[in-house]
Amino acid sequence: MDCHAHVCGPATLFPYAKERIYTPPDATLESYQALLKMLRVNRAVLVQPSVYGTDNRAMLAALKSNPQQFRGVAVISSDPKVVSDQELADLHAAGVRGLRCNIVDIADKSAGLPIDQLRNLANRIQPLGWHLELLMHVNEYPNLAKTFEEFPVDLVFGHFGYVHAKHGIDDKGFQGLLELMKNQRAWVKMTGPYRICDGDLPYVDMRPFNDAVIEANPNRLIWGSDWPHVMVKKQMPHDADLCDLLDSWAQDSSLRNSILVDNPCILYDFPALKS
């Protein structure tokens, strides 16, 4: 299962938010489905990209096209007056199973982690069995484990916690992430190694981080293609090469099955696949 991809456009049908930090080329559902077919991937999770803000229409249209194949992670306002409980229920019926909170690209970073807003969102989605997906640099939060140890929902951290390889695995924030994994509080997406190291494939600087999250809790790991790889300034490898990279980083077949099949079925509420 591909647990991290975005659909963007066509912009004529799904226009981007005026306040955005980049403008992606169209990355349509049809193009993504062609990629899934090429990779022989049957299920996928579509994550709301920041260029759409809280307008989830493009993602929801993709979910509607094949409810058996797709799940979604939405972005909503933290104000309960803006999004009603019925609207949350409608998102659930459409296939949404989590909310994304982008801490990296917020306009004002001086206020620190918006913990009260995150907790309010978590309390609202807890009855639905959803999770919060956090895009944040965990190295900026040395008290990460203490902050989230009693959060009411599971947390999903993208891009190995989005900590650059130069910080090393002993970084306090990354160690906090490992602690949350060990205590069944956090999941980690094994995505975007090219975003957090300076080298090219096979991203050897990221191998210690990969090994650390596997050791912490292999049942809390999921994988994603990160398609269409927005805002990546270095040369991108072929998506099939990223799949092959997982084979080398998780060499045990039962471990790969957990990462690619069993774990995401649990997190995203997919029916278990028959063996």
Which functions belong to the PLM regions below?
Residues 1, 5-7, 117, 121, ...:
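A generic "structured core" feature
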Residues 1, 25-43, 218-220, 234-275:
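Mid-to-C-terminal alpha-helical segments outside catalytic/metal-binding sites
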Residues 1-5, 44-47, 71-74, 99-101, ...:
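Hydrophobic faces of well-ordered beta-strands that scaffold small-molecule active sites
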Residues 1-54:
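An N-terminally biased module of ancient metal coordination in phosphate/nucleic-acid-related enzymes
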Residues 4, 36, 59, 91, ...:
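Conserved, mostly hydrophobic/aromatic
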Residues 12-15, 144-145, 167-172, 198-207, ...:
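Histidine/acidic-residue-rich catalytic or RNA/ligand-binding cores of hydrolases
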Residues 53-139, 146-148, 187-196, 274:
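Active-site gating/metal-coordination segments in enzymes
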Residues 112-223:
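Catalytic pocket-lining loop regions of alpha/beta-barrel enzymes
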